[in-house]
Amino acid sequence: MPRHAFRNGKHLNAVPETGGEETGFLMEKNDMLARALGNLPFRRNVRAREFTTFRIGGPVTFFAEPKDADELCAMLSAARSCDYPVYIIGNGSNLLVSDSGVEALFIRIGARMAGVGFDGTRLKCGAGALLCTAAKAAVAEGLAGLEWAAGIPGTVGGAVAMNAGAYGGEIKQVLKSVTVVECGRIAKKIVHAGDLGYRSSV
């Protein structure tokens, strides 16, 4: 049986069950990634039920939670150097992982990158902040525009990536700029509403 992970009804990955020679190859790739990650924080063979809201799913070979953008860059560079598959996730909502597991590095942008603060009349959030937390913080500060997000269980990063929306509101209506990791570099980008479409972003 193939190993699968799904998000929004789409395959995240499909890795066939392997025999002796291929299993040895995968083990070698796993060891290569472990060495490349070095002192970066990661765990091996973590069950997906630990990080999905459905609390189901088999083991993923590597699981990591960066504390900041620099650590995220380092993790992505390590995986790229080994040609190892990577999936970046947030709160684990809308995510199903097969009980068979997935051979990949799962990077969760979570509580370690979940800061919420203000810069004048602008709300600044880490990608790991819960969207509902950001919405409540905005209301408490008297800022309008994010009320529709109060009941959404995902993270700010996930909401930006898919241009989340509900009740007539969308992230693109309030998003002004983002800090992204792009080709191993950290960059800030100004965002225009036209850059985001229905459940999609650039």
What residue ranges belong to the model's regions?
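Basic/polar N-terminal segments that are highly enriched at the extreme N-terminus
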Residues: L12, L26-E28
